[in-house]
Amino acid sequence: MVSRRIYRPRDLFSLMQSTLATENFFISAYEIGIVDNFPEIRVQAEVSARENRVRRFGGEPEILISEIYDEILKKHPQLSPATVKKIIDLEIQMEKIVLYKNARGSCLFEKAISDGCKVILISDMYLPSVILKELLTSCGYDISNIPVYSSGEERYSKNSGKLFSIVKKNENVDITSWIHVGDNVHAD
């Protein structure tokens, strides 16, 4: 349904780094060290958060963005919680900037809606569903009455099939009449 204007998802962190380096972002001199290596710090924090999730709870390494930034705070205690909140907000804002409505996905979505199909959106993503809805809305989708599931919130992925089981149960849908459209042959 959406695509990014960047080559790899992690390129978002390089874009964030440029913004973090501006005077307008108000990172103190004490906190500035994070800017120089932000893309690597952000990637490693996500890896650590996933590993810690599995080590502590077992199961799948599905996490939320807050857990990623908790890892950054652990390794960079000089950051204030207020700065971390601003960086999380920046990441979400940057996602809005790089995301755009995918023509093929949009056509399929609109066709399903116009045909009266029950549409449910499922994402393997560390962002909570409320933020996913915000991102989709900013791309021009009307999803006001459409359920959105995030693997991070549910703690299960599409790849394992467990996220689909949760959706099936919660939405009371018959799996034999289910049509799933995705962009990843392995996960979808």
For each feature predicted by the language model, list its residue ranges:
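A metal-dependent, Asp-based hydrolase signature
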Residues: 16, 23-90
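Short acidic capping loops at alpha-helix termini that bridge into adjacent secondary structure
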Residues: 143-147, 175-177
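Short, surface-exposed basic-aromatic patches at helix termini and helix-loop junctions that form
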Residues: 136-142, 169-172
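Asp-based phosphoryl-transfer active-site loop
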Residues: 1-10, 14-17
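Catalytic cores of eukaryotic secretory-pathway lumenal/extracellular enzymes that build
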Residues: 153-159
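Conserved Lys-Pro-Asp/Glu-containing loop-to-beta segment of HAD-superfamily phosphomonoesterases
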Residues: 161-186
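Short catalytic/ligand-binding loop motif for oxyanion handling, primarily in non-cytosolic enzymes
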Residues: 1-5, 48, 52-58, 67, ...
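Substrate-recognition element of Asp-dependent hydrolases with the DxDx(T/V) motif
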Residues: 84-137, 148-149
